[in-house]
C-alpha cells in the first residue's frame, strides 16, 4: 500500500509495526536503513554496518523526507520511503555519493522510539 505525503514523499509499507507507537517531534528513534539512488546504487546502510542509526526526528537532524516520513511509521514497521530531491539533499547533493537533486530510496525499519 502506497501513501504520498508532504513533499511528494512516498511510503510503501512492507510489513506492519505495532500500529500504536508512532514517533513524535523530538523523539529519539532507532532505525535500520539502506539508502539507494533510484538506479539501485547503494550509498549507505546501517544494516551493512551492523549498527542501527539513532536521531531525534522532526527537528532537522536528518533529511526532511525522514522528518516527515518516519513519524508515519509505528515501531516494528518496515517500509520503503521514496524521497524527491528537495526533501533529500537538494541541489547540493552529497559530493562523491549523491548527485544534486537526486530522488533517494530508503528501506527502513523503525526499531525503537524513546
Swiss-Prot record:
Please tell me whether the keyword Acetylation is annotated for this protein: yes
Q: What class of enzyme is it?
A: isomerase
Q: Name one GO biological process term.
A: negative regulation of homoserine biosynthetic process
- Name the predominant localization: cytoplasm
Sites bearing Phosphoserine, chain numbering: 51
Protein origin, superkingdom: Eukaryota
Give the location in the cell. Cytoplasm; Mitochondrion
Q: What is the effect of changing residue 49 to I?
A: Abrogates interaction with FAP1
Annotated Gene3D superfamilies: 3.10.50.40
Protein's name according to its UniProt entry? FK506-binding protein 1
Protein's organism: Saccharomyces cerevisiae (strain ATCC 204508 / S288c) (Baker's yeast)
What broad taxonomic lineage does this protein's source fall under? Eukaryota, Fungi, Dikarya, Ascomycota, Saccharomycotina
> What gene does the UniProt entry assign to this protein?
FPR1
Amino acid at each position: 500500500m502506497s501513501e504520498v505525503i508532504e513533499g511528494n514523499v512516498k511510503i510503501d509499507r512492507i510489513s506492519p509495526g505495532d500500529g500504536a507507537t508512532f514517533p513524535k517531534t523530538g523523539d529519539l528513534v532507532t532505525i535500520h536503513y539502506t539508502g539507494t539512488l533510484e538506479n539501485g546504487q547503494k550509498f549507505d546502510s546501517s544494516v551493512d554496518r551492523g549498527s542501527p542509526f539513532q536521531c531525534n526526528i522532526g527537528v532537522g537532524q536528518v533529511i526532511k523526507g525522514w522528518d516527515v516520513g518516519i513519524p508515519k511509521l509505528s515501531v516494528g514497521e518496515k517500509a520503503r520511503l521514496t524521497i524527491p530531491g528537495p526533501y533529500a539533499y537538494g541541489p547540493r547533493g552529497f559530493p562523491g555519493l549523491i548527485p544534486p537533486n537526486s530522488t533517494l530510496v530508503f528501506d527502513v525499519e523503525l526499531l525503537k522510539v524513546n
